[in-house]
Amino acid sequence: MSNIKLIVGLANPGAEYAQTRHNAGAWYVQELARICNVPLVAESKYFGVTARATLHGRDVRLLIPTTYMNLSGKSVAALANFFRILPEEILVAHDELDMDPGVAKFKLGGGHGGHNGLKDIIASLGNDKNFHRLRIGIGHPGDKNKVSGYVLGRAPAVEQERINAAIDEAVRSTEILFNQDMAKAMHRLHSFKAE
């Protein structure tokens, strides 16, 4: 059984960023909220939109920070501190350059890999890296100088379909995570690749 009490989807705020690759984490949380039939509501004290959902009979908070990506930790720490949620009880969903579109993987701990949202969350949690991540593959532009424009751009339709399929599979795997355990959820999700 999972001990996850907070699921965070990283994003930049505003309509101009809503469909950009950098917002893949938010797409996952939005899909979880839809499946759980709960509205994401703006909560200024948490600097984000949030919902209280039930997954397999257990309470979990959903959060999409409405700060910019590089200030995500302000939002995560505000909610986690208020509800006394420990880093190891947090799952952060984010876009991952080092994985192809159509792939998603769970991971516990590790560095930020250059991801500004993760970097700020780690700092805001007292440099504690021991939180869970859901890495959603978006692919890499092939040149590190093009990364900023790439993550803030929209994926072509075929790539977007693969990203969406991986998110759907991640949602199904999250249900396994809450109903069974992380090992089974990882086994299912890590063997999936959208074609």
Curated annotation (Swiss-Prot):
It is found in: Cytoplasm. The record marks 12 as: Discriminates between blocked and unblocked aminoacyl-tRNA. Keywords: Cytoplasm, Hydrolase, RNA-binding, tRNA-binding. The keyword NAD does not apply. InterPro entries: Pept_tRNA_hydro (IPR001328), Pept_tRNA_hydro_CS (IPR018171), Pept_tRNA_hydro_sf (IPR036416). SUPFAM superfamilies: Peptidyl-tRNA hydrolase-like. One of its GO terms (biological process) is protein quality control for misfolded or incompletely synthesized proteins. The record marks 95 as: Stabilizes the basic form of H active site to accept a proton. Hydrolyzes ribosome-free peptidyl-tRNAs (with 1 or more amino acids incorporated), which drop off the ribosome during protein synthesis, or as a result of ribosome stalling. Catalyzes the release of premature peptidyl moieties from peptidyl-tRNA molecules trapped in stalled 50S ribosomal subunits, and thus maintains levels of free tRNAs and 50S ribosomes. HAMAP family: Pept_tRNA_hydro_bact. Monomer. This is Peptidyl-tRNA hydrolase. It comes from Shewanella frigidimarina (strain NCIMB 400).
